[in-house]
Amino acid sequence: MAPALTLEKPVETNAFPRKAASVETSENYEGNYKFAPIEEAQVSRAMIKRYFNTMYDRAISDVVIVGAGSAGLSCAYSLATQRPDLKITIVEAGVAPGGGAWLGGQLMTPMVIRKPADAFLRELGVPYEDEGNFVVVKHAALFTSTLLSKVLAKPNVVMMNATAVEDLIVHEDFAGQQRVAGVVTNWTLVALNHDTQSCMDPNTITAPVIVSATGHDGPMGAFSAKRLVSTGLLKELGNMRGLDMNRAEPAIVNGTREVVPGLILTGMELSEHDGSNRMGPTFGAMIGSGHKAAHEAIRILDRHKVVNGKVVA
């Protein structure tokens, strides 16, 4: 678990630099609300310039996190907080980040988090009801939206959502080992339609550390773990076992690690790799596993020499 941090003060609107509008505007809600004028091309260029500048810059990243569910976002928050010098790039296949953390079990809204993971809620400023051995957030979206907003506010974090990881970059490293050296990406709509169209080649992001947090459900579930098998880096999957909350959560947190050089598995993806139990609608392990993945990523970076996104010593 990451050490407790002082809560960040909310950013006030007047802290942002403002340029004067070219014409008079008005926030009069009595029928006289006036916007500053804009050209359609200005909107397009404003988006394109920033997005593709981000793609250009993050073609080499320090850490890529695959999946923006509760484990991936917890990892991103912890990592960005501890190491603001790192370029952290989150790749999320869904249009809406958050994975399965927008609801609790069976589409119900409350979220259950076992102690001691409740410390993270206090760090984020998320209110909850204390039930003794666990706490309950009144709506899972309160936790997820708070965490997501804080992650995206970190200046060293970018997220590319609606973007799927289609493959892993695997190179022989300085020691002669096969090492995961980055990810292969594409628009999710393209990735899901390779059977309907031809020749839609992907893009790449190079990074010395990949944290895969793709869960176990859905079309992209446990993607990296499954790809390790098909590439021959892993003999077979352990396959997730049946539900046992008391066995599952500590197994996921304690088992979070670098499973092959350059690739850390976290969250429920690890259960498919290791053959551990599922825990169902309790989220403490996702927080703890994400934090441990951040610590593992820092440990890997600290013990290797990295040049242009590649581990060289």
From Swiss-Prot:
Q: Which InterPro entries match?
A: FAD/NAD-bd_sf, Sti35, Thi4_fam
Q: Which cofactor does it need?
A: Fe cation
Q: What is its EC number?
A: 2.4.2.60
Alphabetically, the GO molecular function entries are: cysteine-dependent adenosine diphosphate thiazole synthase activity; iron ion binding
Which terms are listed as keywords in the entry? Cytoplasm, Iron, Metal-binding, NAD, Nucleus, Thiamine biosynthesis, Transferase
Q: How is it modified after translation?
A: During the catalytic reaction, a sulfide is transferred from Cys-199 to a reaction intermediate, generating a dehydroalanine residue.
Entry's SUPFAM superfamilies? FAD/NAD(P)-binding domain
Main location (coarse class): cytoplasm
The UniProt entry's GO biological process terms, in alphabetical order, are: thiamine biosynthetic process; thiazole biosynthetic process
Name the positions where substrate binds.
71, 92-93, 100, 165, 201, 216, 268, 278-280
Transmembrane segments in this chain: where? Answer: none
Matching entries from Pfam families are given as: Thi4 (PF01946)
Q: Which residues carry this modification: 2,3-didehydroalanine (Cys)?
A: 199
Cofactor binding description: Binds 1 Fe cation per subunit.
- What this chain does, per the record? Involved in biosynthesis of the thiamine precursor thiazole. Catalyzes the conversion of NAD and glycine to adenosine diphosphate 5-(2-hydroxyethyl)-4-methylthiazole-2-carboxylic acid (ADT), an adenylated thiazole intermediate. The reaction includes an iron-dependent sulfide transfer from a conserved cysteine residue of the protein to a thiazole intermediate. The enzyme can only undergo a single turnover, which suggests it is a suicide enzyme. May have additional roles in adaptation to various stress conditions and in DNA damage tolerance.
PANTHER family, alphabetically?
Answer: THIAMINE THIAZOLE SYNTHASE
Q: Which family does it belong to?
A: Belongs to the THI4 family.
HAMAP family linked: THI4
What protein name does the entry list?
Thiamine thiazole synthase
